[in-house]
């Protein structure tokens, strides 16, 4: 049973490494969905277009960092993903909740006031070509401003989060043990 579990884990890790999206020759993060046969980025529901995921990817990186003896390939994968999160961090903005003109709960992304503290944010979806945050309604049309999608999808889906902060926190300890120059001999 132990051997079967190890084989299954190794296959899963191999799949994770194969699905890390390569953009302009550089590994990034993972897509929200991948085709089950080709492993390429894929659409899911109408509002879930093929995209890089600023949400699903953080759990993948946390899982990879939990491995007790990461291979050089896993180390490189983690390093590339952490770098992508750093480069695509959205600073100086916050989520503002409000009641819209219909009296319904709503939200918007607003620029922080000078000197105001805010957590960095990451979008749920980024374009595959150039890492632009985007949003989508049930019509399947990509929008670059969340206010352009309907209230139901805007408020019924998690479009921004700060979960990558967990990645950065764990990476601090992980990199001391396994970072780029620490894997010789593993």
Where are these regions (language model features)?
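Short, surface-exposed glycine/acidic/tryptophan-bearing loops
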Residues: 29-36
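Beta-propeller domains
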Residues: 1-27
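Terminal, non-catalytic domain-edge segments
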Residues: 4-11, 37-42, 48, 52-186
């Amino acid at each position: 049973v132990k051997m079967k579990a190890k084989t299954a884990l190794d296959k899963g890790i191999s799949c994770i490494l194969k699905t890390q999206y390569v953009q302009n020759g550089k590994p990034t993060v993972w897509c929200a969905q991948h085709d089950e046969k080709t492993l390429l980025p894929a659409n899911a529901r109408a509002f879930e277009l093929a995209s890089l995921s600023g949400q699903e990817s953080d759990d993948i990186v946390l899982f990879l960092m939990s491995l007790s003896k990461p291979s050089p390939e896993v180390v490189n994968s983690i390093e590339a993903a952490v770098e992508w999160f750093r480069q695509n961090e959205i600073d100086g903005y916050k989520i503002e909740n409000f009641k819209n003109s219909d009296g319904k709960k709503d939200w918007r992304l607003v620029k922080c006031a000078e000197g105001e503290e805010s957590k960095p944010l990451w979008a749920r979806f980024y374009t595959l070509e150039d890492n632009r945050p985007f949003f989508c309604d049930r019509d399947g049309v990509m929008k670059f401003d969340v206010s352009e999608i309907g209230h139901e999808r805007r408020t019924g889906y998690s479009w921004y989060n700060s979960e990558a902060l967990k990645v950065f926190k764990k990476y601090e300890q992980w990199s001391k043990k396994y970072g780029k120059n620490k894997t010789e001999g593993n």
